[in-house]
Amino acid sequence: MNYSLIQISDCHIDDNKYSMGVNTHINLKKIISRISHINIDVLLITGDLTHKGSITSYKALQQMLYPIQIKLLIIPGNHDNKNNLSATFSKNLFSQFTLGKWEIININSVQVSKTSGFLTKDELIKLELNLAQSIAQYILITLHHPTVPMNSTWDDSLSLENPEALFNVLDKYHKIQAILFGHAHQAAEFKRLGVKIISCPSTALQFNNETRIGFNYYTLYDNGQLTINTQWI
């Protein structure tokens, strides 16, 4: 059986509807309207759900997501407030999730009060344990921060600070098919040792010359193949 997954990222919902010079509420509603007409199994949000982390902004986001009555998986970003995010979306935060022969494993790359990401020793140990114990045939890794240079105007110093520590763990496991992240506000795809490395565009605005908003649509196949279609509005 094949599965469909949509990834959105960096919504930056704020109390006054505007952040970074755009109405992030209207933009996200456009994305949700498009997604609500697509038959999918999982919606994944890879961080920065809100801009300042207020409880009211999470409640507003919760209301906006209501039309999408499917499994929702959420990971935090550097703009998120851990306590307020957990208070609103505790049932949606995850470390592992199974989809047939596939497993999605999340790692937390967020540092308190820093824009860039870092994987602590404890986080790497947990990742290694999750990978070693996984009975899935194929694995997706998710985190907020980019794990490779973006080859764009993006400032790579704001990405994951210790990607080599991550790859030292991941390179031991050949079941990993892709790494998905956000943070860079741009669509991009790379490949490393046969593993797809995929950046998701923002629902708010992009940091490159792209003027549209968008999301990534994935199909996970029973044979381990993964296809991606970035959709723009």
From Swiss-Prot:
AMP binds at H12, D48, N78, H79, H185. Binds 2 Fe(2+) ions per subunit. It comes from Vesicomyosocius okutanii subsp. Calyptogena okutanii (strain HA). This is Probable cyclic nucleotide phosphodiesterase COSY_0614. It comes from the Bacteria. GO terms for molecular function: 3',5'-cyclic-AMP phosphodiesterase activity; metal ion binding; nucleotide binding. The keyword Metal-binding applies. It holds the Pfam family Metallophos. The keyword Ligase does not apply. Signal peptide: none annotated. Fe cation 2 binds at D48, N78, H144, H183. Its cofactor is Fe(2+). Keywords: Hydrolase, Iron, Metal-binding, Nucleotide-binding.
